[in-house]
């Protein structure tokens, strides 16, 4: 089953990810879930190589952690 997103949905996703997705070490993706003065809370999403390996297959779905795994892998770092 294929899900087609509307242009508005695509724009919303792009806007959310634009300033909140980053690579901490060049090998993994993290999504910012909380920004406070001088402090960033992020969640590990996956390895960049895994995403690139699936990029040619439009129907590929990356393995996702359960909610408990995601929350347990949350990390913090200081913003310079």
UniProtKB/Swiss-Prot annotation:
One Pfam family of this chain: Baculo_LEF-10
Source taxon at top rank: Viruses
Similarity comment: family membership: Belongs to the baculoviridae LEF-10 family.
Keywords, ordered alphabetically: Activator, Transcription, Transcription regulation
Protein name: Late expression factor 10
Purpose of the protein: Involved in late/very late gene activation.
């Amino acid at each position: 089953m294929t899900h087609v997103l509307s242009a508005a949905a695509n724009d919303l996703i792009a806007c959310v990810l634009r300033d909140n997705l980053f690579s901490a070490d060049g090998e993994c993706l993290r999504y910012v879930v909380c920004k406070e003065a001088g402090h960033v809370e992020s969640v590990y999403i996956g390895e960049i190589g895994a995403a690139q390996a699936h990029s040619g297959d439009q129907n590929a779905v990356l393995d996702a952690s359960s909610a408990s795994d995601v929350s347990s892998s949350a990390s913090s770092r200081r913003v310079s």
